[in-house]
UniProtKB/Swiss-Prot annotation:
Binding site for Zn(2+) 1: 9, 12, 33, 36
Assembly with partners or alone: Interacts with poe.
Organism expressing this protein natively: Drosophila melanogaster (Fruit fly)
Protein name per Swiss-Prot or TrEMBL: E3 ubiquitin-protein ligase Kcmf1
Family per similarity comment: Belongs to the KCMF1 family.
Keyword Metal-binding carried by entry: yes
Catalysed reaction, written as an equation: S-ubiquitinyl-[E2 ubiquitin-conjugating enzyme]-L-cysteine + [acceptor protein]-L-lysine = [E2 ubiquitin-conjugating enzyme]-L-cysteine + N(6)-ubiquitinyl-[acceptor protein]-L-lysine
EC primary class: transferase
Any Pfam family hit: zf-Di19
Highest taxon in the source lineage: Eukaryota
Gene: Kcmf1
Length: 599
């Protein structure tokens, strides 16, 4: 069952919801789902301070407590409706309420009834402690139901056994206990029977009076019967879950219980009889030693009886170990057994233990006595037989040695193969690492070479740029000077220089002609031509003053003047023609000399 059937959340109105269910122990019929409870939902009648009982579904209980030996039909903890403390069982809740809330008379909802599958979910009571005492008190009386109690009392067998002393281990929860009056009668002797608990009898009478008659008592009996049926079903399920054992065992934790229920006795001779040791005279037998791991006494022994006290008894005891086989054989004399356990019925049973062993005797119908006596010498026997070394034949030893050798060879070959595999893996990994290192080194070298070439190219480019800049810087002043010269000398200057040169040449020619005429016509002034030739006209001085530099043909004109005179004297025709030219040049010079010099 994974849903809360027939239950709806009073906040979100979700019906048949999954998960945890929280029931308010103050408000009547008020339930919340896990989400609404965690959100702290409140209403006009419900507050956050109200105690809530958490109820789980059967599937959730199996999920949470599946590996534990707990009942699956009841919640594992209850909440106090007065102080909101959690984690109580039904018994501890009763003790808590009786100790701390005796004077509280608030009407609350019973959390035990609300948590039980077949209980009343909305049972409101103002005497919560009394309700727990009458309805949910399950103490030492839980081993006998209310339906079986009157018949047990009538037959004189009203026995209530303590749960901690029953067979099958200590009690974990009350639902794990199932019982019957017949088992109680067969387990205990008449001297160990207990009388009816007077407090329980008084409470049962008060419950009948409080409920007001037989119908209420019958209802209580029906409820107890239903609860008993549920407990029996739960116990049967848990027994089915337990592992099957091949032989019955007796736990050492329950050693005080009656061993007659487990050990079945048989009739013997005059000395005594029992399931453990049997014989005539003193009684001899053997049993298995206690298992040191589980502290249990397995009754698995093979017995051999002897007719006299001097007969020898041999028992084969098998003990399980982890990886070895132990075959234990023991023999004892003088009518002794290993543990000296003998059971007598209606008489006296004596058990003589071996060397250093103890004797145990129990009786169901009468009294039993047992004693342990020491053997001849402590060194001749062993206290713990299971630690005796087994004896093997040569063939068995050979088989054992061969198996050991096979195992050692197998382990050796396995280790060698593993080491070889690891070595191969390491070599392969080293080779791959070496290859990768070589590849990385080659790539790194290529990168370095490329970087070096790039740096060299950049250096060459930088040097070329520097040289070009230097050349440009050197050529720039020359170009500037050339430009300045070109700016200073224009075409007009060349025209002016040529004009000046022509004028000066014409003046020179005129002056040379005038001097010749004066020398030829007047004898009174023989040096007139020379003087005329030696003086510069005013026009020449003006032109020379304007130009600021001598004409390039001045020296040539001065040198040509005596040559012209010689030619004129040597060739009269040429001199006449030259005279005409000089005259024309003189008239032209006279025209030019008429310009006044304003400077």
């Amino acid at each position: 069952m994974s849903r809360h059937e027939g239950v709806s959340c009073d906040s979100c109105l979700k019906s048949n919801f999954n998960g945890r269910r929280y029931k308010c122990l103050i408000c009547y019929d008020y339930d919340l789902c896990a989400d609404c409870y965690e959100d702290g939902v409140t209403s006009t009648r419900h507050l956050v301070e109200h105690p809530m009982q958490c109820i789980l579904t059967r599937s959730d209980i199996e999920l949470y407590f599946g590996g534990e030996m707990l009942a699956s039909d009841q919640p594992q903890s209850f909440t106090c409706p007065y102080c909101k403390k959690m984690g109580f069982s039904d018994a501890t809740l009763l003790e808590h309420v009786s100790a701390e809330h005796t004077e509280t008379s608030l009407e609350v909802v019973c959390p035990v009834c609300a948590g039980l599958p077949g209980g009343e979910p909305n049972l409101v009571t103002d005497d919560f402690a009394g309700h727990l005492t009458l309805e949910h008190r399950q103490g030492p009386r839980e081993l006998i139901s209310f339906l079986d109690e009157p018949s047990a009392i009538r037959h004189g067998g009203g026995v209530r056994r303590i749960p901690g002393r029953t067979l099958g281990g200590p009690r974990t929860r009350r639902s794990n206990m199932h019982f019957s009056s017949s088992s109680g009668l067969s387990a205990l002797s008449p001297s160990g029977r207990e009388s009816v608990d007077p407090i329980a009898e008084l409470l049962s009478q008060l419950s009948g009076v409080r409920r007001g008659g037989p119908p209420t008592s019958q209802l209580q009996q029906l409820q107890m019967q239903m609860q008993l049926d549920r407990q029996q079903v739960t116990a049967s399920r848990q027994i089915d879950r337990l592992p099957r054992r091949a032989h019955p065992i007796v736990s050492t934790s329950n050693s005080n219980a009656a061993m007659a229920e487990v050990i079945s006795g048989g009739a013997g001779g005059s000395g005594g009889s029992g399931a453990v040791g049997s014989g005539s005279g003193g009684g001899s037998g053997a049993t298995a030693p206690p298992n040191l791991r589980t502290t249990e006494w397995p009754v698995t022994a093979s017995f051999s009886t002897s007719a006299s006290n001097h007969s020898q008894t041999q028992s084969s005891l098998a003990a399980n170990s982890l990886n070895a086989r132990e075959a234990i054989g023991t023999s004892s004399s003088a009518g002794s057994n290993v543990l000296g356990i003998s059971v007598g019925v209606g008489g006296t049973a004596n058990g003589n233990g071996g060397a250093g062993s103890s004797g145990v005797a129990t009786g169901a119908g009468g009294a039993g006595q047992g004693g342990g006596q020491g053997g001849a010498a402590a060194g001749e026997s062993f206290l713990l037989a299971q630690f005796m070394q087994p004896t093997f034949t040569e063939a068995e030893w050979a088989v054992v040695e061969s198996m050991r050798a096979d195992r050692s060879m197998f382990v050796q070959s396995l280790m060698l193969s593993m080491l070889c595999t690891e070595a191969l893996d390491l070599n392969a990994s080293d080779e791959s690492l070496a290859k990768s290192d070589n590849v990385n080194k080659g790539q790194q070298q290529q990168q370095e070479d490329a970087e070096a070439e790039a740096q060299a190219e950049t250096l060459l480019n930088n040097n070329a740029d520097v040289e070009q800049q230097q050349q440009q810087q050197q050529l720039q002043p020359a170009m500037v000077r050339q430009v300045n010269q070109m700016q200073q000398t224009s075409p007009e200057d060349f025209v002016c220089d040529e004009y000046r040169y022509k004028n000066k040449k014409a003046n020179t020619t005129q002056t040379s002609g005038t001097g010749g005429l004066g020398g030829a016509g007047a004898t009174a002034a023989p040096g007139g031509g020379a003087s005329g030739a030696g003086t510069k006209p005013t026009a020449d001085r003006g032109i020379e003053r304007r130009s600021g530099r001598p004409p390039p043909g001045e020296m040539a004109t001065g040198s040509q003047q005596p040559q012209q005179q010689q030619q004129s004297t040597a060739n009269p025709a040429a001199s006449q023609q030259k005279y005409k030219q000089n005259a024309s040049a003189a008239t032209a010079a006279g025209n030019t000399n008429q310009i006044p010099d304003t400077r």
